[in-house]
């Protein structure tokens, strides 16, 4: 059980009588508790308090008119704890005892009535607590299952979409591969065609060179024929001029065979042309082989680069697909987290509202308990004073030797209420009563701080003021 700290505050007031005697001593005790104090039968205390208010406040009205004048007042044993009357008793001691007996009977009847009402209120409060139904949060389990099914379907659909996107990307990659191969073959074809065109140009140049050489040979042949013809003409002219007059014998070298020389020159030129043709053909073949080797190596390098590019593209596409899948998963998880946070925040708000309501109810119940505890202590104090008064009445009933004077006061004298702690002072008929003194109130407040059944501190404050 939690430690309770209660600070009781006791107020004690005394009221002086109108004839110079104490008309009664009022002691009002109240408790100011810090925390929660628990008293037995709180519901009964509440009923007892409410009934005590209605019952005790009307004790003054239950007295007969013959005993009290119109100026008689009662405090209901709550304010001052006693009663005083400005009228006078009209009767003997027997009538006074009868009045006190009637008052005691009324008080006992009121006590029984309060006990019955207390029991009734306790039963009603118990029934009310039994019929209270606690707040139950709604069950969302069925909705959670439906949401999980939809989430599974969404994940399956997302995986199917990712698979279709992967297939589409693979088809695009295959199309890119075929396009790249086509472009490679087209570039190779263009290179070969360019080489063929270059070789054709070289062949045309060689053909032109051959035609030039043939033209030069033909011109040389024609020049040789012209020279031969001119030589023969000159020889014939000289022969005609000399005739038979001169017989010249020339011992000269044998004549040169021009046909043989031309044939030799032709053979030399043909050999030279053949050598040039062979050299050009060898150079062309060498250049072609080198170019083919360069083309092959370049094509191999290009093929390797294209293969690497294709692999990198596939890797990039796969990574992009995985990134999209991760983004979609992250978005779904974020949405799920947001929904979960919203749901739990709403539930938390409901729980907080419920907790606030319960705390408000607890604070109200605590305030009611404190108020009922204070009223209960007040009623206990009233009960103690009433028991003392009953004991006083019993003492008055048993001791008949103390009697009132036979004749009332000649002047308007106020009656004296007998209290065990203060002896009664009757009025003297031959001496007029002095004027009534002022009535004063002395309030003594004792504040004690109690924790775990031990008194920690105690303070006393006395305040006097006239009425």
Swiss-Prot record:
- The positions annotated as site (Stutter) read 342
Q: Where is the segment annotated Coil 1A?
A: 94-128
State the residue spans of region: Tail.
401-467
Signal peptide (from-to)? none
- Spans annotated as Coil 2: 257-400
For region Linker 1, the annotated ranges are: 129-139
Using the record's annotation, list all stretches that form the IF rod domain.
93-404
Q: Where is this region: Head?
A: 1-93
Q: Note down the stretches annotated as region Linker 12.
A: 241-256
Q: Which top-level group of life is the source organism from? A: Eukaryota
Annotated GO CC locations: cytosol; extracellular exosome; intermediate filament cytoskeleton; keratin filament
Q: Does the keyword RNA-binding apply?
A: no
- More info: There are two types of hair/microfibrillar keratin, I (acidic) and II (neutral to basic).
Full protein name:
Keratin, type I cuticular Ha6
Per the UniProt record, the source organism is Homo sapiens (Human)
The upper taxonomy is: Eukaryota, Metazoa, Chordata, Craniata, Vertebrata
């Amino acid at each position: 059980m939690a430690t309770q700290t209660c600070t009781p505050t006791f107020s004690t007031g005394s009221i002086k009588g109108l004839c110079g005697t104490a008309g009664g001593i009022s002691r009002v005790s109240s408790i100011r508790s810090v925390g929660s104090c628990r008293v037995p039968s709180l519901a009964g205390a509440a009923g007892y308090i409410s009934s005590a208010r209605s019952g005790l406040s009307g004790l003054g009205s239950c007295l007969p008119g013959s005993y009290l004048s119109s100026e008689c007042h009662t405090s209901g044993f709550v304010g001052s704890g006693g009663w005083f009357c400005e009228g006078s008793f009209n009767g003997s001691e027997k009538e006074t005892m009868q009045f006190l007996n009637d008052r005691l009977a009324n008080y006992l009847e009121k006590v029984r009535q309060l006990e019955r009402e207390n029991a009734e209120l306790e039963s009603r409060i118990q029934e009310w607590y039994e019929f209270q139904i606690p707040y139950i949060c709604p069950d969302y389990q069925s909705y959670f299952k439906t949401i999980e099914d939809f989430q599974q379907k969404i994940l399956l659909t997302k995986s199917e979409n990712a698979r279709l996107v992967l297939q589409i990307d693979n088809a695009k990659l295959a199309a890119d591969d075929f396009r790249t191969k086509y472009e490679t073959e087209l570039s190779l074809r263009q290179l070969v065609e360019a080489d063929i065109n270059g070789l054709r140009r070289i062949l045309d140049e060689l053909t032109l060179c051959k035609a030039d050489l043939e033209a030069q040979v033909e011109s040389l042949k024609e020049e040789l024929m012209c020279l031969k013809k001119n030589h023969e003409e000159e020889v014939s002219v000289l022969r005609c001029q000399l005739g038979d007059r001169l017989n010249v014998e020339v011992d000269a070298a044998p004549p040169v065979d021009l046909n043989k020389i031309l044939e030799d020159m032709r053979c030399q030129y043909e050999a030279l042309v053949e050598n040039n043709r062979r050299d050009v053909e060898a150079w062309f073949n060498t250049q072609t082989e080198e170019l083919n080797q360069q083309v092959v190596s370049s094509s191999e390098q290009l093929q390797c680069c294209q293969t690497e590019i294709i692999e990198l593209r596939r890797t990039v596409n796969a990574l992009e697909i995985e990134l999209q899948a991760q983004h979609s998963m992250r978005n779904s998880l974020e949405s799920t987290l947001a929904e979960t946070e919203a749901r739990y925040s709403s539930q938390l708000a409901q729980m907080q509202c419920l907790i606030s309501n319960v705390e408000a109810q607890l604070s109200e119940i605590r305030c009611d308990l404190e108020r009922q505890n204070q009223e209960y202590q007040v009623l206990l104090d009233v009960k103690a004073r009433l028991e003392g008064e009953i004991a006083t009445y019993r003492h008055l009933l048993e001791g008949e030797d103390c009697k009132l004077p036979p004749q009332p006061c000649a002047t308007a004298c106020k009656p004296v209420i007998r209290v065990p702690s203060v002896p009664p002072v009757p009025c003297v008929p031959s001496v007029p009563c002095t004027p009534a003194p002022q009535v004063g109130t002395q309030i003594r407040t004792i504040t004690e701080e109690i924790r775990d059944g031990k008194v920690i501190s105690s303070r006393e404050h006395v305040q006097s003021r006239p009425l």
